[in-house]
From Swiss-Prot:
Keywords: Amino-acid biosynthesis, Cytoplasm, One-carbon metabolism, Pyridoxal phosphate, Transferase. This is Serine hydroxymethyltransferase. The lineage of its organism: Bacteria, Pseudomonadati, Pseudomonadota, Gammaproteobacteria, Enterobacterales. One of its GO terms (cellular component) is cytosol. It comes from Citrobacter koseri (strain ATCC BAA-895 / CDC 4225-83 / SGSC4696). PROSITE patterns: SHMT (PS00096). The record marks H228 as: Plays an important role in substrate specificity. It is found in: Cytoplasm. GO terms for molecular function: glycine hydroxymethyltransferase activity; pyridoxal phosphate binding. The modification N6-(pyridoxal phosphate)lysine is found at K229. Homodimer. It catalyses: (6R)-5,10-methylene-5,6,7,8-tetrahydrofolate + glycine + H2O = (6S)-5,6,7,8-tetrahydrofolate + L-serine. GO terms for biological process: glycine biosynthetic process from serine; tetrahydrofolate interconversion.
């Protein structure tokens, strides 16, 4: 018999210590990795529930196992909320991750060797949009598109590449692009050659849910997202579509199960359902509006302090600092800021002379600090501290001074009060 009072602390001290140390790290460090966020205790309650015990291969009402009457309710809630939130008429909530959602789209729409037009990873794209080290680059013929000299997506180049290479699918979306994407323009280009438009909105899904960023669902044939990042839910994936193409929906469902996955993670799907409900609340819209304001506030400080921001600003939750003129690498900046309890990630910048393991830039995102309650004043103060560290990257006294300020502001703005 399993006793409810069983716990990790009494049984596995080594594991518990690591878990507790991570909890402390999250509370005492400022998180600026654009893809990270803090999920709610309600989501964590769902993920720690007895739903983790249930196998449920198939879809609601069409399971391969018995005893699914209640997990059917859970999954249908998640499906219905996803459709309502994003204005879709199809949703699949089973993908274990954004990458697996993307894999399902590829396998549903394409054959190995088909040509795909995707954003260059070095200019803001994602691994699954055609990187040679990823399944997408290994299985498909990838033609990359990029950005122009102003740092914006070059739609003219995209249209020319589409006419020249006749891809079967064009991918919109990014992992390190600070602008607004013209989804309608991308659909126009796709339609001109009879291609699918597939949008990966993982980074901006929360902003889209709150009407802070344009929604691709009315324009794309298929849309995927993660459920964490700006959406602030559990780690997982989601596929959406609109337009009533039932054959397409069947292909997408089959590509997730049984093609790419077996049993869905019902405890995670419950977490998705909770997060999607939270995203419908008025305070979520206020949160996302503040995410955008905080990113802009930080950019203003970096520009005033003489730092180069790729594209000159941001229109979403993230931006890239180009450190080439500062004679700093992204790796050095990442490490120095880390010593001050400020977490970022090194990131390639356009025309980066350094390798992806070193880079010449860092990516900065505002979702997590905004979740803590930071507003423009705190965001600007933080950006100033970061400039102090980067201006004095080898001065440990400066770094220690900033670390003290970080600890103070973290105590004033706890993650979980």
């Amino acid at each position: 018999m399993l006793k409810r009072e069983m716990n990790i602390a009494d049984y596995d001290a080594e594991l518990w210590q690591a878990m507790e140390q991570e909890k402390v790290r999250q509370e005492e460090h400022i998180e600026l990795i654009a893809s990270e966020n803090y999920t709610s205790p309600r989501v964590m309650q769902a993920q720690g529930s007895q739903l983790t015990n249930k196998y449920a291969e198939g879809y609601p009402g069409k399971r391969y196992y018995g005893g699914c009457e209640y997990v059917d309710v859970v999954e249908q809630l998640a499906i219905d909320r996803a459709k309502e939130l994003f204005g879709a008429d199809y949703a699949n909530v089973q993908p274990h991750s954004g990458s697996q959602a993307n894999f399902a789209v590829y396998t549903a729409l394409l054959q190995p060797g088909d040509t795909v037009l995707g954003m260059n990873l070095a200019q803001g794209g994602h691994l699954t949009h055609g990187s040679p080290v990823n399944f997408s680059g290994k299985l498909y013929n990838i033609v990359p598109y990029g950005i122009d000299e102003s740092g914006k997506i070059d739609y003219e180049e995209m249209a020319k590449l589409a006419q020249t290479h006749k891809p079967k699918m064009i991918i919109g979306g990014f992992s390190a692009y600070s602008g607004v994407v013209d989804w309608a323009k991308m659909r126009e280009i796709a339609d001109s050659i009879g291609a699918y438009l597939f949008v990966d909105m993982a980074h901006v899904a929360g902003l889209i849910a709150a009407d802070v960023y344009p929604n691709p669902v009315p324009h794309a044939h298929v849309v995927t997202t993660t459920t964490h990042k700006t959406l602030a839910g559990p780690r997982g994936g989601l596929i959406l579509a609109k337009g009533g193409d039932e054959e397409l929906y069947k292909k997408l469902n089959s590509a997730v199960f049984p093609s790419a996955q077996g049993g869905p993670l019902m405890h995670v799907i419950a977490g998705k359902a909770v997060a999607l409900k939270e995203a419908m609340e008025p305070e979520f819209k206020v949160y996302q509006q503040q995410v955008a304001k905080n990113a802009k506030a930080m950019v203003e400080v970096f520009l005033n302090r003489g730092y180069k921001v790729v594209s000159g600003g941001t229109e979403n939750h993230l931006f890239l600092l180009d450190l080439v003129d500062k004679n700093l690498t992204g790796k050095e900046a990442d490490a120095a800021l880390g010593r001050a309890n400020i977490t970022v990630n090194k990131n390639s910048v356009p025309n980066d002379p350094k390798s992806p393991f070193v880079t010449s830039g860092i990516r900065i995102g505002s979702p997590a600090i905004t979740r803590r309650g930071f507003k423009e004043a705190e965001a600007k103060e933080l950006a100033g501290w970061m400039c102090d560290v980067l201006d004095n990257i080898n001065d440990e006294a400066v770094i220690e001074r900033i670390k003290g300020k970080v600890l103070d502001i973290c105590a004033r703005f706890p993650v979980y009060a």
